[in-house]
């Protein structure tokens, strides 16, 4: 990927990176392990972003 990216694209990629985290441990504890995964998790090789 290009080193010089447009700011809007960089912000979109940063948002996608922040969203792509696991469910926090405190949420798992609070919900008594009902919530373990979240469906919007993205693996970089399988699902590509619309850029």
UniProtKB/Swiss-Prot annotation:
Is the Ribosomal protein keyword given for this protein? yes
Query: From which domain of life does this come?
Result: Archaea
Which InterPro entries does this one have? Ribosomal_eL39, Ribosomal_eL39_CS, Ribosomal_eL39_dom_sf
Q: Which is a Pfam family this sequence falls into?
A: Ribosomal_L39
Swiss-Prot/TrEMBL keywords: Ribonucleoprotein, Ribosomal protein
GO molecular-function term, one example from the UniProt record: structural constituent of ribosome
GO biological process terms on file: translation
Q: Which GO terms describe its cellular component?
A: ribonucleoprotein complex; ribosome
Q: How does it assemble?
A: Part of the 50S ribosomal subunit.
Family in the record: Belongs to the eukaryotic ribosomal protein eL39 family.
Alphabetized NCBIfam families for the sequence: PRK01242.1 (NF002316)
Protein known as: Large ribosomal subunit protein eL39
Q: Which organism is it from?
A: Pyrococcus furiosus (strain ATCC 43587 / DSM 3638 / JCM 8422 / Vc1)
* Source taxonomy: Archaea, Methanobacteriati, Methanobacteriota, Thermococci, Thermococcales
């Amino acid at each position: 990927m290009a080193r010089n990216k447009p700011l809007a694209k960089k912000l979109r990629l940063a948002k996608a990176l922040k969203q792509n985290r696991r469910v926090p441990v405190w949420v798992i504890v609070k919900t008594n392990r009902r919530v373990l995964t979240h469906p919007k998790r993205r693996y970089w090789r399988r699902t590509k972003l619309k850029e």
